[in-house]
Amino acid sequence: MGSSFGDLFRISTFGESHGGGVGVIVEGCPPRLDLDVDAIQAELDRRRPGQSHITTPRKEADQVEVLSGLLDGQTTLGTPIAMLVRNKDQRPGDYKDMAVAFRPSHADATYQVKYGVQARSGGGRASARETIGRVAAGAIAKQLLAKAAGTEVLAWVKRIHTIEANVDPQAVTLDAIESNIVRCPDASTAAQMVERIEAIGRDGDSCGGVIECVVRNPAPGLGMPVFDKLEADLAKAVMSLPATKGFEIGSGFSGTLLKGSEHNDAFVPTDDGRLQTATNNSGGIQGGISNGEPIVIRVAFKPTATIRKEQQTIDSDGKATTLAGKGRHDPCVLPRAVPMVEAMVALVLADHLLRQQGQCSLW
């Protein structure tokens, strides 16, 4: 329960941080889609640990194995696609102290309350290694969206702690995002972000921030009325990622400071009859349905829970104790969370694209 996502384009992830491996089963991918498996690996490389000095030093190649669902390793058959990444660099000994004391603001305590047992080593299913399956599946969704609708999904780090970049969602490029280790397309701001992460990490602490994501050229008409609104599904998708604490779309919370006459997106005539608005405060979605304008969302991530600083907590018997986190943990999750956000957004859009085709494209 709780490890599957989507309706028609559906994924189920499996595995623990310090188990044999992690992976995903993708169901509902249309047949005859020529997949670039190297592109799947490239997405996993963006997510993998040990890629820079501001991420966890855990060393994992995160090499994907596609076990089923492809003809000649390329063409989708329309059957379940199973992908596996084996864990190679586990260190269970790092979690000895955490086996008897709950990490503040981590899932240790709530998993124990719910299940009466927990995978203490590495956090089990609460570990960010679970997102490997999501990123692999999201890479397939990205290729489906690009081929079927010409849709592009890009995310970047907008803010680290108190340092914020002002990035134009319409102008941002993947090359600019990937030009530095923090994945902020504004080079000067990125340098400040790196310095802040370094300083906080040296102090044994951690920091959070905001990731912004744009969907360019989304198919219009995606989303369902009432409970399956597109922004509602996007919110659920990205808020299911580890460490997320907030979601906004379009003008977001700042839109509450505007009057209706200031916030409304005026429609303008077009030569081809498609919908177009003069502004995009709606973030590309109105009434829960995409209007074809760029979809712009932002996701807030809290500081990493496991830190080297000593903190007050309780042990498994409820007695007061202290805990200083050991192991290899990101001082800031945001640089590696960028492909995770892209993946979850792509999965939602792929699912809704298939639902739209199934319901509204018969005649």
UniProtKB/Swiss-Prot annotation:
Q: NCBIfam families per the record?
A: aroC, PRK05382.1
Cofactor entry: FMNH2
Record key words, sorted: Amino-acid biosynthesis, Aromatic amino acid biosynthesis, FAD, Flavoprotein, FMN, Lyase, NADP
Which residues hold NADP(+)?
47
Question: What is the annotated quaternary arrangement, including any partners?
Answer: Homotetramer.
> What EC class is this?
lyase
Full protein name: Chorismate synthase
Keyword Cell inner membrane attached = no
The UniProt GO MF terms for this protein read:
chorismate synthase activity; FMN binding
Q: What organism does the UniProt record list as the source?
A: Parasynechococcus marenigrum (strain WH8102)
Q: Which residues bind FMN?
A: 125-127, 287, 302-306, 328
GO CC terms: cytosol
Q: What is the lineage of its organism?
A: Bacteria, Bacillati, Cyanobacteriota, Cyanophyceae, Synechococcales
Q: Which PANTHER family match?
A: CHORISMATE SYNTHASE
Q: What is its EC number?
A: 4.2.3.5
Family, per the entry? Belongs to the chorismate synthase family.
Give the source's domain of life in one word.
Bacteria
> Which pairs are disulfide-linked?
none
Coiled-coil segments: none
From the UniProt record, report the name of the gene that encodes this protein: aroC
| Cited function | This reaction introduces a second double bond into the aromatic ring system.
